[in-house]
Design a protein with these regions (language model features):
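Non-catalytic, soluble scaffold/interaction modules
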Residues: 1-169
Length: 169
């Protein structure tokens, strides 16, 4: 909540439908390829967003995306997801179960900084899941007129994309 008054059009953030069925699969290798493609698309997308954030907003906001890129490049997390795929689960299920495990682990920590990393994992896994499902997620960098954001929740990456030139509240 911000103090003051802002007048602009409402930009209602509607969460994309990222629901899926938990499915057992038989073609493990093609499922791993799907996962790696989703990771690759997410990486390219985050590199572009990071570079734009760097140019428009500076190092601090770009650092959020650099952290997300590190998560995407974490061989331990990717390996844990691939183990679940090898156990016969579809990539979506493997991703969500692995992300949930990491999120719960970070949220249980005593260190506030580490607890905040749970939001980063949630954000990155949502991006990868959107690519697995072929669903577009919101991109605030495309806003080019004055707006007031109306949303239940904003992820770290969405918040970092907010351009105060156009976002009035």
């Amino acid at each position: 909540v911000s103090s003051g008054i802002a007048i602009a059009k409402a930009y209602c953030l509607i969460e994309p439908d990222l629901s899926f069925e938990k499915v057992k699969i038989t073609d493990i290798e093609s499922e791993k390829v799907r996962l790696k493609e989703a990771f690759k698309k997410s990486t390219l997308e985050l590199e572009e967003i990071r570079d734009t954030a760097q140019t428009k907003f500076g190092d601090e906001k770009a650092a959020i995306f650099s952290a997300h890129l590190l998560l995407l490049g974490d061989p331990e997390m990717l390996g844990a997801i691939e183990v679940k795929i090898s156990d016969g689960w579809n990539a979506e299920t493997a991703l969500q179960e692995t992300a949930t495990m990491y999120i719960e682990m970070f949220e249980a920590m005593d260190n506030d900084y580490m607890k905040e990393r749970a939001a980063d994992i949630r954000d990155v896994s949502t991006r990868v899941l959107s690519h697995l499902l072929g669903v577009e997620i919101p991109d605030f960098s495309r806003i080019s007129t004055d707006v007031i954001i109306v949303a239940e929740d904003l992820t770290p990456s969405l918040t970092a994309q907010l351009d105060k030139t156009y976002v009035k509240g």
